[in-house]
Amino acid sequence: MGGEYPLNCSAPGKVLLSYSESDDIKAYFNDPISKMTENTIVDYSHFISEAINIRQSGYAVDDEEFAKGIICIAAPVFNCEGCVVACVGLSTLTLYDSIHSLTNKKLELLKGVADEISKKLGYSAKE
């Protein structure tokens, strides 16, 4: 619990960065980025493609991008103005689960929690 995780290789970080202004995303990738594992995204173009998927699907995954053996899913939390102000994430070890199993078993629950928090913050999704 606690600690700091890079925005480009953690599911919560990827959610927050994906919903940032495009200039902020570019600025983030202008700084040197460490490749934490062979799965870490360090290329701006690759991340933009991932960010589009995150915005469309409403969640992000970290498939051993931050550290070998650790996987995570995260969903955005919106405020009353429709801005992402936080996210809800769930991490586990590959010893216990796979990213596909975690996504299939827990994603809807996770997104439901994020939606409930968003509603409490005054967010109303546009249908």
Question: Which functions belong to the PLM regions below?
Answer:
Residues 1-66:
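Short, solvent-exposed recognition segments
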Residues 31, 40, 44, 69, ...:
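Residue-level detector of alpha-helical recognition elements and their boundaries
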Residues 71-75:
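Short hydrophobic beta-strand micro-motif common in sensory/regulatory domains
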Residues 77-80:
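Sensor-regulatory modules in signal-transduction proteins
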